Amino acid sequence: MAKSQKLEILLIEKDEITLELYQRELSKSFNVMAFTDLDGVLENLTRRDIRAVIIEPETCTGQGWDFINTIHKEFPDRSIPIIVCSTRDESSQNRGKHVSSYLTKPVLPKTLHEKTLEIVKS
């Protein structure tokens, strides 16, 4: 896939080392816009053709779950897959009704890459 044809995804992760590891791996297949907080994320969702959002809900003092709900309220006509990659196992607490996949850390970058490819291609 040529660089200009890479699909765009958002990666929101508060830990800069984890962010760099995930971004490096995901960049093999995607144009990754990486954020350590929520500043600028909605603007990118509005202006770009984002194909998936990968988020650590604990980003920005735990407001990640509210942000996931905001995505679905602000963009009801777009089906943007959300992949939660979290240190907390909250997958069974019904918080992820808008979540396409829930991964509990530690998650290898390759595993996240494969899951993202699977979801974006479906």
Task: Give the role of each language-model region.
Residues D66, T87-K105, E114:
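Alpha4 helix (beta4-alpha4-beta5 surface) of REC/receiver domains from two-component response regulators
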